[in-house]
Swiss-Prot record:
HAMAP family: ATP_synth_E_arch. This is V-type ATP synthase subunit E 2. The gene is atpE2. Pfam families: vATP-synt_E. Keywords: ATP synthesis, Hydrogen ion transport, Ion transport, Transport. It comes from the Bacteria. GO terms for cellular component: proton-transporting two-sector ATPase complex, catalytic domain. One of its GO terms (molecular function) is proton-transporting ATPase activity, rotational mechanism.
Length: 197
């Protein structure tokens, strides 16, 4: 049976391929712009060197270094912006796929299985409340009938999954799909950063 992790991993591989192509294309473009700018500055330096004295040459060299430094800073900023945009696009695409997943029959089985496993790990189930989003509340309220476990009529603003909490607010187990997305965010960020190295 294909798990959500398998789907996320497959999706990540597909996205990484697309991201890699996009990165390489944009890096080539940035390198060409930097190369053209550097060549232009070098021509200016040679022209001034031939016409002016040594002091003028020092001033031009200083200006050139400042421009190169400025370009490098701009390039770094563009790369940071590109990485951030790629991470956000990937996460948005992942979120859309997860929303589609919540509409499938696999999702119902996933929640039942995941919830059973989560509840097994909780020793004292007295006063436990399970929260779902509005759509899932309708699906699971009748299905989940556990001793000492209450399904709240109050819905949470989550894509899918559930949140378990006790009545005294002493503990909370967040098994919402947003948490899965947040966990993927760091991995996606690391993978995209590695593409630029």
């Amino acid at each position: 049976m294909v798990t959500i992790e398998d789907k996320i991993n497959l999706f990540s591989k597909i996205i990484y391929g697309e991201v890699d192509d996009k990165i390489n294309s944009e890096l080539d473009e940035l390198e060409n712009v930097e190369k053209d700018t550097i060549e232009k500055e070098e021509r200016e330096v040679k022209k001034y060197r031939n016409k002016n004295m040594q002091s003028v040459e020092k001033k031009i060299k200083s200006k050139f270094e400042k421009e190169v430094f400025k370009l490098k800073l701009e390039e770094q900023q563009q790369l940071l912006n590109l990485k951030e945009n790629m991470i956000n696009e990937t996460l948005e695409s992942l979120k859309e796929r997860i929303i589609d997943f919540t509409k499938s029959d696999e999702y119902i089985n996933y929640i039942k299985s995941h919830l059973d496993n989560t509840l097994k790990d909780i020793e004292n189930k007295e006063g436990i409340i399970i929260y779902f989003n509005k759509k899932d509340l309708e699906k699971f309220k009748k299905v989940i009938n556990k001793d000492n476990v209450e399904v709240s009529n109050e819905s949470k603003d989550i894509i899918g999954g559930y949140i378990i909490q006790d009545k005294n607010n002493k503990f909370r187990v967040d098994c919402s799909l947003e948490i899965s997305i947040e966990e993927c965010k760091e991995k996606i960020g690391i993978s995209i950063t590695e593409l630029f190295m």
